[in-house]
Amino acid sequence: MKNISGVDVTDRQPSVRGGTGWTYGVGSRCLILVDGMSVLTPGSGEINWNMIPMENVDQVEVLKGASSVLYGSSALNGLIHVKTKRPGLDPVTQVNVQGGLYGKPRQDGTPLYGGLDLSHSRRIKNFDLTVGANTFLDDGYRQDNYNRRVRVGGNLTYHDPRVQGLNYGVNVNYLYNDYTGFFIWRSPEEPYIQSPLANMGRRENTFYIDPFLNYTNSEKGTTHRFKGRFFHRGSRIITHTTDKSLFDITNNMGFDISSVPEIINMAQNWQTELLPTFLPYLPEVMNGKVSGLMGELGKLGNHFFPTATSADYMDLISWVMGRTPLPDKNNVGAWLVDAMKPMEKKAPEATDHTYSYNLDYQFSKKFEHSQLTVGGTYERIHADSKVTGQHSSDNVATFLQYDHKFIDRLNVSVGVRLEYYRVDDFYREAETKIFGAKVPVKPVFRGGLNYELGEYSFIRASFGQGYRYPSVTEKFILKDIGGVGAFPNAELKAEQGYNAELGFKQGYKFGNLKGFIDVAGFYTRYKDMIEFRFGLFNNKTFDYIDGLSKLFNAFSSGDGLGIGAQFTNVGRAEIYGVDLSTSGVYEFNRDTRLAYTFGYVYTNPIDMDVDSRNAEEEANDDLMAMRSKSNDSKYLKYRQKHSVKGVFDLEWKQFNIGTNMSWKSKTLAVDYFMVDERTKAEPNLMDYMRSMLFGNLHDYWAENNKGYFVMDMRVGMKVTKNIHVQGLVNNLLNKRYSARPMDVGAPRTFILQVGANF
């Protein structure tokens, strides 16, 4: 997937032509299908890549741009359709074993990973049978960032001999997955160690069963397709907060136990012990200057914690978040004595349950030069979760698409989809005026044409609308990621937009070289675009903290302060650019051939409200004033302008050698809470806060956010007709790279694969 031009994956989240930034895997704008059925997790909208039967993949199709007419709201940005193999005349069994290890820089042991894929397909009289299994164990290249999973599944199809063109059957899949996520690092000096503020894992059991029925009447040119699904996921959050005691943490910070009486005295007599030191700086603070005040606080911190680093403060903050309630001036001593005891690790949370029921019907009729497709779909989701609470949703849609071929060269396609969505008691998530009356449905339209200019030469144009409802998780999520929170936003609205494309495709052949070149210009526009906002929040009201008054209110009311993220509508956005790709084969001789794919994508991701937003933020002189992103540029967060990808495979007799190459330009903007790239006369309050939480992230990001090049290499051979061996080295040059702050890509990785077909 990562080698497809125009398709990128960040934190499990796919993005087509810059349509998505960083959302930590929730609420995809790109729909992933396996044999026509979505693998998006109901409720969260995240893509469960582990449910895809990779051991049985036949081909992968990518449709770029809005595809919501046929496929629903999650296809706002594009569609990736994975099609599995069908049984042939002879039974086929495939076994693939792989093992690998991560190279430096991690020093504590040698992290390993390995997996086993099994698949078997055959025909038994009128039955088609396919079964598959996968197991995978990955220690991870980062500390405590592992993945362990087992998946089994299959397909059984019965071709009814009594009715020509009738088949029915069932797809079944089960996945057990035990894994931890990696949100942010501990410090720039320890990038492969989890931050104690954000250390969370899950244990999941996912199961679905998909019954289906297909009937094709070739004489009448009609096809009926019925598909259904029952889905269940049981998910248990495992919180891995630090098990260090307060004694361990403060000892690392250079704290002297004899200073405890001094701390108690300061806490009980702060009016005389602390106020005279800090009060003189109040006039400076009122004028927006905090360097003097922060200097005194730094002296106080160095007095008690002379060897403390930002990572130590992370440990301390995480420890405090897990040790509540905090002391008052009357019980400081007793609280400190109790605090010296080791912290007990949190037990697994209660299991969250998500259920989904899906029905889909599609009818198509072929005419002499055209085809009509109509259908409808219904999905009900019920979530009973500590993460989101109890919520239910209904999604009902009907669609129509008409395709017509004119003069043997021109193909025209038009379609419309009507969609209704409800969450809990919000019965009008969308409203549309039809003949003056408001109805709770959203129509989306799509049209396209493809014209054959000449032999192997085509021009195409398309326009498609998109509409994506926020998932239950995006709207109602409330959870603790080991200290970092995720906060709900009940006011989150659906995002909508449209995509237009003009493209040209030309086949070519020069001697033994043949292939095609494709170039497309695209334009995408969004309204109420949903983005991920990282910062400080009120733990009770979930308000975003963007001023001192809100900060003081969070403390004075007892609500408390949380570090975390929230999904929010950012307004209008547009993304336009050019997508250029070519692929082909050069035949040197009967035994030697070179296959290649090369692609370049230029995207310009624009925040259309940037001028008004910058003016509003510039006018806010509050000491805790927040900005929407790390700079004043016009660009959306977590996007790159340029992307180049190349795949080359040389085959000679039973040997093969190949490489994947990828280059991306720098990330244009990130969250302000992480990095501020603006030039200032002196640091502000947020600069000091970032330094305490994240260390010298500002300089690290400035030095490393300059684009990166990654190269993979593979060498293989066919040992026999049925057995092949392949060795791979990913990140051959061992580049350290990041697409976002506080997340470093995998170092050089060595892999050995052995496969057998019989």
Name every feature range the model reports, one short phrase each:
Residues 67, 84-120, 133, 138-142:
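Short strand-turn segments of transmembrane beta-barrel domains in outer membranes
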Residues 3, 37-64:
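Short acidic/polar hinge/loop motifs at secondary-structure boundaries
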Residues 1-37:
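Extracytoplasmic beta-strand/coil segments of soluble accessory domains associated
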Residues 369-377, 381, 389-525:
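Structural signature of Gram-negative outer-membrane beta-barrels, strongest in the C-terminal barrel
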Residues 225-229, 233-239, 452, 458-462, ...:
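Membrane-embedded beta-barrel scaffold of Gram-negative outer-membrane proteins
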Residues 96, 407-408, 514, 521-525, ...:
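Gram-negative outer-membrane beta-barrel transporters
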Residues 51-96:
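A beta-strand signature from Gram-negative outer-membrane beta-barrel systems
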